[in-house]
Design a protein with these regions (language model features):
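Amphipathic, small/basic residue-rich leader segments at the start of a protein or domain
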Residues: 1-101
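N-terminal glycine-rich flavin-associated loop
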Residues: 98-117
Length: 117
């Protein structure tokens, strides 16, 4: 049985407003703690990819890679609107990190569409 729910609009449904805001608040805290404007400019100037920040985003405390994975499989159960909202907030911080985050989200699609129990 495929994981994908065939119900119309399922990919848009996603998180309830409170949960979405909680994830957005987490992104804001990440920015405040790790992504000052000076640090982002330093990444650009030195042509550094901030691997440690990506690892933090994907770590057990934040787990942003779980956004689009259904809750039944350990994810957050987010939808396209959630991905858009979070990507938009991240783009205000750093496009490089946003691109990495969105690329990681693309990896959820094959799991949702083709994985079996």
């Amino acid at each position: 049985m495929a994981l994908q729910d065939k119900a119309p609009g399922r990919s848009l449904a996603g998180l309830d407003p409170e949960s979405r805001q909680m994830v957005l608040d987490t992104v804001a805290q990440l920015k405040k703690r790790l992504l000052s404007k000076e640090r982002i400019l330093e990444f650009d100037r030195k042509e550094i990819f901030p691997e440690e920040i990506i690892r933090e985003m994907l770590g057990p405390e934040i787990g942003l890679q779980l956004l689009m994975i259904p809750e039944a499989y350990g994810g957050l159960g987010g939808g396209a609107r959630d991905s858009c909202a979070i990507t938009r907030e991240m783009a205000k911080i750093c496009l490089g990190i946003t691109t990495a985050f969105f690329a990681i989200q693309l990896g959820a699609d094959p799991l949702i569409v083709g994985a079996t129990e």
